[in-house]
Amino acid sequence: MERNLRKKRLGRVVSDKMDKTIVVAVETKVRHPLYGKTVNRTTKFKAHDENNEARFGDRVLIMETRPLSKDKRWRLVEIVEKAK
């Protein structure tokens, strides 16, 4: 698979308690099929953070990668914005 064809997601770190792993919550807006209201959907991804640099509340960019563990298939690309 080409490196630039891999999916990328922008989200917020909701947990950094594991070693070399962060949990990133990604929000997407979806229109309800019947009522048409825009609804926020949240999906959590476990991502590999090699240097343990991301902290709780940071906005991060993650990229799809090969399976690294049972449920880790993403890795940290960059920290877009540090938490205050």
UniProtKB/Swiss-Prot annotation:
Function, as annotated: One of the primary rRNA binding proteins, it binds specifically to the 5'-end of 16S ribosomal RNA.
Gene: rpsQ
Superkingdom of the organism of origin: Bacteria
GO molecular function (one): rRNA binding
Source species: Clostridium perfringens (strain 13 / Type A)
NCBIfam families xrefs: PRK05610.1, uS17_bact
Transmembrane intervals: none
Cross-referenced InterPro entries: NA-bd_OB-fold, Ribosomal_uS17, Ribosomal_uS17_bact/chlr, Ribosomal_uS17_CS
GO CC annotations, alphabetized: cytosolic small ribosomal subunit
Name of the protein in its database record: Small ribosomal subunit protein uS17
Quaternary structure and interacting proteins, as annotated: Part of the 30S ribosomal subunit.
Family listed: Belongs to the universal ribosomal protein uS17 family.
GO biological process: translation
Keywords recorded for this protein, A-Z: Ribonucleoprotein, Ribosomal protein, RNA-binding, rRNA-binding
